[in-house]
């Protein structure tokens, strides 16, 4: 439900892009936007991707 707060945050988790972005696949999740997440790649570039486009490494 929308009124309940759950602390299942994936912010700070390492992830791997399924489809590489300009040769880069590894990054860190820095924010969540519902179905999309913001990923900072190892080259410093920040991109917005859908959750099903990444593998989250716990």
Regions found by a protein language model. Give the residues of each.
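Basic/aromatic-rich interaction segments and small domains that mediate binding to polyanionic partners
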Residues: 2-58
């Amino acid at each position: 439900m929308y009124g309940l707060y759950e602390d299942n945050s994936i912010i700070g988790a390492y992830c791997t892009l399924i489809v590489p972005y300009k040769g880069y696949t590894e990054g860190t999740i820095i924010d969540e936007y519902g179905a999309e997440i913001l990923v900072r790649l190892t080259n410093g570039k920040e991109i917005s991707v859908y959750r099903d486009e990444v593998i989250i490494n716990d």
